Amino acid sequence: MITAKAVKELRERTGAGMMDCKKALTETNGDMEKAVEVLREKGLAAAAKKAGRVAAEGIVKTYVSEDMKKGSIVEINCETDFVALNEEFVGFAGRVAELVANSNVNTVEELLAEKLDGDKTVQEVLTELIAKIGENMSVRRFERFSVESGLVQSYIHGGGRIGVMAELACEASSPVLAEVAKDVCMQIAAANPLFLSEADVDQESLEKEKEIYRAQALNEGKPEHIVDKMVMGRIKKYCKEVCLLDQAWVKDGDKSIAKLLEEKSKEVGSPITITKFVRFERGEGIEKKEENFAEEVAKMGGK
């Protein structure tokens, strides 16, 4: 006979519904371990069905080691903002971020094959979470950071909507370095720079911008001899918008990020440079499916 206590235990272990737990125990003649396997198998089937659904919500999570010498940033997606706030989902994202920082994986495929909880791989834990919560989820991307002289810093905005990580190099050890690194991360979150400096802007993009500005100037009827000067002026303005070092600091519009680093370098007695940064915005680039409410109602009604 299947007891209520056994059903409760199985439910706590698997997160499956009460009726599903009772059926699994009945099917396995009360064998708890076999019942867990049965539910996992059913969970895997359910997860496979959900894999076709668009997961454009989710969370960006960061991890920085205590000594601030290494860190990582990951984006993990789900289908709804409600699940993005789920404690288990958020906890999973945090554990994956820490795993990335302490591993040598280079691709999402390699990451999914890494052990996360005991003998379970990231993929296995993710699949179980999909089955338990009932939404499609995916590990989308990650970036790992490591520095010898300097530190790694992160910033999360909007409860995981935007995440930033930056790597700053400096020979000096000072609390000021962590402060400026946090300011840099907040700048990246707010201003969304595409490049570190003008030297990093790819020439193809720069030439395209020049062509656009030249055409605009000529269409405005500007004389040919001043068009080049106008184009260069507009390119400078473009670089101030997309290059981190050229951007006006969000906390003080009269000061560029390059100027901020220069001042802080003098304060700590050693040059501070930004060697790497990344900004993840949840769901960016994912095409969301437009839902047709009438169709959904018709489907539910079996029409």
Swiss-Prot record:
Regions annotated as coiled coil: none
The name this protein goes by in its record: Elongation factor Ts
Signal peptide: none
Gene: tsf
Gene Ontology CC: one annotated term: cytoplasm
Pfam families: EF_TS
Keywords: Cytoplasm, Elongation factor, Protein biosynthesis
GO MF terms, alphabetically ordered: translation elongation factor activity
Organism placement in taxonomy: Bacteria, Bacillati, Bacillota, Clostridia, Eubacteriales
Organism: Clostridium perfringens (strain 13 / Type A)
